[in-house]
Amino acid sequence: MRGFNLLLFWGCCVMHSWEGHIRPTRKPNTKGNNCRDSTLCPAYATCTNTVDSYYCACKQGFLSSNGQNHFKDPGVRCKDIDECSQSPQPCGPNSSCKNLSGRYKCSCLDGFSSPTGNDWVPGKPGNFSCTDINECLTSSVCPEHSDCVNSMGSYSCSCQVGFISRNSTCEDVDECADPRACPEHATCNNTVGNYSCFCNPGFESSSGHLSFQGLKASCEDIDECTEMCPINSTCTNTPGSYFCTCHPGFAPSNGQLNFTDQGVECRDIDECRQDPSTCGPNSICTNALGSYSCGCIAGFHPNPEGSQKDGNFSCQRVLFKCKEDVIPDNKQIQQCQEGTAVKPAYVSFCAQINNIFSVLDKVCENKTTVVSLKNTTESFVPVLKQISTWTKFTKEETSSLATVFLESVESMTLASFWKPSANITPAVRTEYLDIESKVINKECSEENVTLDLVAKGDKMKIGCSTIEESESTETTGVAFVSFVGMESVLNERFFKDHQAPLTTSEIKLKMNSRVVGGIMTGEKKDGFSDPIIYTLENIQPKQKFERPICVSWSTDVKGGRWTSFGCVILEASETYTICSCNQMANLAVIMASGELTMDFSLYIISHVGIIISLVCLVLAIATFLLCRSIRNHNTYLHLHLCVCLLLAKTLFLAGIHKTDNKMGCAIIAGFLHYLFLACFFWMLVEAVILFLMVRNLKVVNYFSSRNIKMLHICAFGYGLPMLVVVISASVQPQGYGMHNRCWLNTETGFIWSFLGPVCTVIVINSLLLTWTLWILRQRLSSVNAEVSTLKDTRLLTFKAFAQLFILGCSWVLGIFQIGPVAGVMAYLFTIINSLQGAFIFLIHCLLNGQVREEYKRWITGKTKPSSQSQTSRILLSSMPSASKTG
């Protein structure tokens, strides 16, 4: 068969070749085998003999031009059939068809292959069909770290997850460069083609896996506080960690505030051992496990404005006193409180003391229990019932016992203000004791309001301004108490009138009122601007010859005594006595009977002497200003001294008792302070000048303007007193003015702002005068003959001694008015001090010859001689003028 085909193919080729080159036109042979004539059929056709005929048929792959399969027409041609344009394509899918003459050739497209191979033509063995080539079977088709994906007729390479295509290669992708690759609190770990997320220490994955990718899982904080911290501590969980903190009241054993070491312990802090005390002064600290508590000692209570919780706990003194506060510095009372057996002589005394303290302790020891004024008052009644037994005690024991009792009653009353009971009793009336109290609410809302409190016929009148001045910080209240029978034991033997030390032995004293007491909350108890008025009922009618004395009970190292300081008599009648006091205290009235001539005598001497001094000072000032013959620096010093003394004594007479206006009284006291100090400083100036004069006797013109200027002397004489007054007023402005006189306060020690400089000047003057007398003794013998013959040496010596009194001896006498010679000292002080102006006029005017001559000319009307020797007058004028330069 194969050979036949080849033969046929060859024959066709030969015929084609022949036909193409030899194509003679001849008439077909109709007889026999017609197909012998090759020209009968066109090229690419076959001739087929039939009976008596033939027909032509185009070969395979060709088609007749007339569309007939068999034809004889010589004009018909066989045209090549384009099989590749047929549909479907003869080569099949995924192939390419190439038309050939009479046939076609099949080849597979790229990516496909046929078992017969490409360039297949019909007739070749096998069936041509194109199937896809799987390129991915070849390992080198795609680069490393990529995946090959086969497709129909092709393939593709894609980088694996975790890689990125770059320059026909697959490079690793660093997923950790993206902050969103892992969740919060995780660490990203990049690997080749992959990455992993690991939770940070202190966190764990929500998926439960150690490593993970992406945000499908989260890192959740591990709560380490379940069992990581020791006892008495607090565990604080933080993101990824934790720390331990000891509870308040505990401290870590390693000293670190926050710790994680499990070996650390939280140990209790003993806050009560700290210095200074955690609770503050006057407190009691009690330590507890992890805490402590604060309390206050007796006599103190917690400050309501602070708290232990806030760390500002403090104890402030209660409104009332407790046992520790009222015990005076007395050996007998101390023995009663030592807890040991007392001497038989003190048994009764200690029993009375302990009875009083038992009532007071009930109030002080229980700081929260309310205090009933009625109950505590009745508790003191048994003490007053036994007051007659106090007469067997010594004076010191009686005064100590009275001090304890009076202060205990005051403390109990103040306690009732601080811890009042539900049923407040404003007044308690008993046979031996009356108390009327008043809590201040709206009573003092208006100005100039006064309150009256009455007890046993006695009365206390107090203004709201005084209550406000008491500086009460909590409950404000006042009370008035009157005791029955206490005047019999606290009698006149406990009184010493320090304001009238000159009373004679003929004066008799007696108690003539009940002992009363004013009680008020607040720390300030005395020195009030507005006085407190006490009206005390006389036990016996006052006689005309009797002088009442208001006395207050003052405690001292020996227990206590009556004193007249701080109170004055406003009015006295037969039935009552009105006292004006600048203090809240226990009071009574003592009647003094007998001759009081010495007090009156001093009053007359003082006022008459001051009036005489004022007249003399006016004359001296006029003399220094008008007498030209003696006008020099020395007379200027005398002039300033006289002016200051004149103003001081005038203001003293006119304003010492102007106490109605508080501010005006303080101003008067301030001016008196300044003027009297100025007198002393000008006296000091004169002492210095006198010293210089005697020391420089040989140099007559020793006081020239170029040595000492008057301006400097004035600055000293007026400036230093002003400095003392300004400093004193700045330190204690309330020291100026008292309730009974406009002078410096003698009860607070403020008087030393005057006495201090005075004593200093006196000491300096004494030293200068002593030195002056010594120099005078040495120099008088060397004075030139001309001066010594003037017989003025005795006058100079007299002036030196007289200057001693002018420069302060009288004030020395005033300071030493104590002891048995107090009366004599008082007389000397009053006489010399009141006549100080007269002494100045006598020494510097009447004993000066030039002045006497001027007086004579003024009186007689004669004119001054034209020529007069001044040489003999040098020492008489005490100091030459600067213009007298010889």
UniProtKB/Swiss-Prot annotation:
<feature type="domain" description="EGF-like 3; calcium-binding">
    <location>
        <begin position="132"/>
        <end position="171"/>
    </location>
</feature>
<dbReference type="InterPro" id="IPR001881">
    <property type="entry name" value="EGF-like_Ca-bd_dom"/>
</dbReference>
<feature type="disulfide bond">
    <location>
        <begin position="199"/>
        <end position="219"/>
    </location>
</feature>
<feature type="topological domain" description="Cytoplasmic">
    <location>
        <begin position="691"/>
        <end position="709"/>
    </location>
</feature>
<feature type="disulfide bond">
    <location>
        <begin position="142"/>
        <end position="157"/>
    </location>
</feature>
<keyword id="KW-0732">Signal</keyword>
<keyword id="KW-0472">Membrane</keyword>
<feature type="topological domain" description="Extracellular">
    <location>
        <begin position="21"/>
        <end position="599"/>
    </location>
</feature>
<feature type="transmembrane region" description="Helical; Name=2">
    <location>
        <begin position="635"/>
        <end position="656"/>
    </location>
</feature>
<keyword id="KW-1015">Disulfide bond</keyword>
<feature type="disulfide bond">
    <location>
        <begin position="136"/>
        <end position="148"/>
    </location>
</feature>
<dbReference type="GO" id="GO:0005886">
    <property type="term" value="C:plasma membrane"/>
</dbReference>
<keyword id="KW-0675">Receptor</keyword>
<feature type="glycosylation site" description="N-linked (GlcNAc...) asparagine">
    <location>
        <position position="189"/>
    </location>
</feature>
<dbReference type="GO" id="GO:0002250">
    <property type="term" value="P:adaptive immune response"/>
</dbReference>
<feature type="disulfide bond">
    <location>
        <begin position="229"/>
        <end position="244"/>
    </location>
</feature>
<feature type="glycosylation site" description="N-linked (GlcNAc...) asparagine">
    <location>
        <position position="194"/>
    </location>
</feature>
<feature type="disulfide bond">
    <location>
        <begin position="246"/>
        <end position="266"/>
    </location>
</feature>
<keyword id="KW-0807">Transducer</keyword>
<dbReference type="InterPro" id="IPR018097">
    <property type="entry name" value="EGF_Ca-bd_CS"/>
</dbReference>
<feature type="transmembrane region" description="Helical; Name=7">
    <location>
        <begin position="830"/>
        <end position="852"/>
    </location>
</feature>
<feature type="disulfide bond">
    <location>
        <begin position="550"/>
        <end position="579"/>
    </location>
</feature>
<feature type="region of interest" description="Disordered">
    <location>
        <begin position="862"/>
        <end position="886"/>
    </location>
</feature>
<comment type="similarity">
    <text>Belongs to the G-protein coupled receptor 2 family. Adhesion G-protein coupled receptor (ADGR) subfamily.</text>
</comment>
<dbReference type="InterPro" id="IPR000203">
    <property type="entry name" value="GPS"/>
</dbReference>
<feature type="domain" description="EGF-like 2; calcium-binding">
    <location>
        <begin position="80"/>
        <end position="131"/>
    </location>
</feature>
<feature type="glycosylation site" description="N-linked (GlcNAc...) asparagine">
    <location>
        <position position="232"/>
    </location>
</feature>
<dbReference type="InterPro" id="IPR009030">
    <property type="entry name" value="Growth_fac_rcpt_cys_sf"/>
</dbReference>
<feature type="glycosylation site" description="N-linked (GlcNAc...) asparagine">
    <location>
        <position position="167"/>
    </location>
</feature>
<feature type="domain" description="EGF-like 6; calcium-binding">
    <location>
        <begin position="268"/>
        <end position="316"/>
    </location>
</feature>
<feature type="domain" description="EGF-like 1">
    <location>
        <begin position="31"/>
        <end position="79"/>
    </location>
</feature>
<feature type="topological domain" description="Cytoplasmic">
    <location>
        <begin position="853"/>
        <end position="886"/>
    </location>
</feature>
<feature type="topological domain" description="Extracellular">
    <location>
        <begin position="732"/>
        <end position="747"/>
    </location>
</feature>
<feature type="disulfide bond">
    <location>
        <begin position="84"/>
        <end position="97"/>
    </location>
</feature>
<feature type="signal peptide">
    <location>
        <begin position="1"/>
        <end position="20"/>
    </location>
</feature>
<feature type="transmembrane region" description="Helical; Name=4">
    <location>
        <begin position="710"/>
        <end position="731"/>
    </location>
</feature>
<feature type="glycosylation site" description="N-linked (GlcNAc...) asparagine">
    <location>
        <position position="99"/>
    </location>
</feature>
<feature type="domain" description="GAIN-B">
    <location>
        <begin position="431"/>
        <end position="597"/>
    </location>
</feature>
<keyword id="KW-1133">Transmembrane helix</keyword>
<dbReference type="GO" id="GO:0007189">
    <property type="term" value="P:adenylate cyclase-activating G protein-coupled receptor signaling pathway"/>
</dbReference>
<dbReference type="GO" id="GO:0007186">
    <property type="term" value="P:G protein-coupled receptor signaling pathway"/>
</dbReference>
<keyword id="KW-1064">Adaptive immunity</keyword>
